[in-house]
Amino acid sequence: MMIDFNDYRRVAGDEIVDQIIKEVKPLQGKDVHHVNSTYYGGGVAEILDSLVFLMNKIGINAGWRLIKGSDEFFHVTKLIHDGCQGADISLTPSMIQVYEETIARNANFTHLKNSDAVIAHDPQVLPLITHYKKNQPWVWRCHIDITRPNPALWDFLKNFINKYDEMVVSDKSFIKEDIKIRQSIIMPSIDPLTDKNKEISLSEAEIILGKAGVKFNKPVISQIARFDVWKDPLGVITAYEIAKKETDCQLVLLGNYATDDPGGDEMYRKTVQRAKESEDVTVLVNLENNDLTVNALQRLSKIVIQKSTREGFGLTVSEALWKGTPVIGGKVGGIINQIIDGKNGYLVEDINECAQKIIYLLKDEELRKQMGEFGKQYVKKNFLITRHLLDYIRLLNRVIG
């Protein structure tokens, strides 16, 4: 059954829904286009899937354009992504040519000239603005952790960024002094009515996970994340092994590949090999009912881990908290905004600290319950799609005028 916008009243409350309906009025009938590089496999695609749908539900003519490219193009953009997060990379002239020519080709059929506003998501699509006569405001929405970007790469990207009207990031630590245009903060969100986040019973969750091969003979801890070096799945396994020596448990790693991440397959293979060397570690990938499986796993886990070493936001943190499960997360990027240390989980800086917090939480059921209750209310107040939608409405009202 298709979701109606008023359905959000029962989970987010009347106040914010009424505020959205009030503030969207100047934007009704306006054409707004989002552009990114993938429809599946990452947080950006997941957010856009809900956000674009809801924008249309409340009267904005919102479209979603996808950049198409070769494997070579996505190899280059993965390097750019990693460089933005601080990796020591360098782009050759031929790589830059692939990057810029692919975007130029896409500009021929992306058809944005009649939009009232364009929102370009992440570095993959950044040069697109250079191929249009700018008749409307353009916003660059950067979803990744740019706390300490590779200096040479950042100098290259700034040439494109400064052509935009505004740059939107997910955390105040990502604001850059060397960017001339306006910068603002919009934190991401989860959609509480999707299959991934809707209410399901524990018995339903057990059936779903059972079909995926998960057994319940030992307490479950989990990490749900793309197979990516920045998510540190190998470090999670090591932390789990340390914890398991003191309190018996099992680890489930559930992930997928984003269509714009050619390195995911290699990290998946490394993770599977590392899991084989351990005990009671299950690795699940690209499942048919992935969203429901994530939902079930986050509900039935005693603890969810998000041990990222760089993180733009980390939607899986709020997803797990929404289900009343405490989270142990890396003390980086947007995770810091979601985990209130000691209240709904713990922020950790290394493998040993992660392991000790796993042990501590597994041994204290009452604390896990208290953290879960606090976490759900914290997400309701701060990280639901309704707040996110209102932030975008205010952004668009400001830039369109």
Describe each PLM feature range.
Residues 1-31, 49-114, 186-192:
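A conserved catalytic-core segment of Leloir-type glycosyltransferases
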Residues 33, 209-231, 237, 251-252:
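Conserved donor-binding/catalytic core segment of Leloir-type glycosyltransferases
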Residues 255, 259, 264-296:
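Nucleotide-activated donor-binding/catalytic signature segment of Leloir-type glycosyltransferases, i.e.
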Residues 295, 318-322, 336-337, 343:
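Short alpha-helical segment that forms part of, or immediately flanks, the ligand-binding pocket
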Residues 309:
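Aromatic "clamp/platform" in nucleotide-sugar-dependent glycosyltransferases that forms part
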Residues 326-329:
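Short hydrophobic beta-strand element within catalytic cores of glycosyltransferases
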Residues 341-352, 360-365:
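Conserved acidic donor-binding segment of nucleotide-sugar-dependent glycosyltransferases
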Residues 360, 367-382, 388-394:
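A short, well-ordered alpha-helix in the C-terminal region of glycosyltransferases
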